[in-house]
Amino acid sequence: MGNICRSPLAHAVFEDIVKKSSAENSFEIESCGTIGYHVGELPDARMRETARHHGITMSHRARQLKKTDLDEYDMILAMDNENLANIRKLARNRDQLDKIQLFRNFDPDAVGEAEVPDPYYGGAEGFEIVFQIVARTAQNLLTELTTHKR
C-alpha cells in the first residue's frame, strides 16, 4: 500500500539476486505503493533491519504507482489482494490487466496462501517471515523469467 515494507523488500531482494546472477542488464526493477502516504520516505526501519541482517540494503524511496507504469513495465506484481484490486482499477486495457498478478504466484511454497502478509503492525518475527517468503519467491521469479522468458 504505502511502499515501505513488502514491495521495497521484494525490490531490494530481487535486485540483489539479479546482480548475483549477472542478469542485471536484463531487468528494470521498481517498487511503488498504491497509496501515497509515505512518498519519498525510506522503507520501515524494522524492514530495513531485517534485510540488513540478511546482507540486503534497502535504499529505495517510496513512490506511488502511476497509470503510466502499466505501460512502462512488462510485469506488475502485487503483494496482496487489496493492492491487486487497486492496481487493476488503473488498467485501461486487456494488455495492462494481463501484466498484473500476485507476487506469490511465483512462490513454490504458497499452497493456499496467495498473499505476502503485511508485517507493519506486528513484531520482529513477522518481518523475518516476510523476508523468507520474499527471498524464496524472488529466487523462483528470476528462475521463471530467465527460463521461460515471460
Residue spans for each PLM region:
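Conserved active-site segments centered on acidic
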Residues: 1-73, 143-150
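Helix N-cap/beta->alpha junction signal
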Residues: 7, 80-81
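Phosphate-binding/catalytic loops
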Residues: 75, 81-150
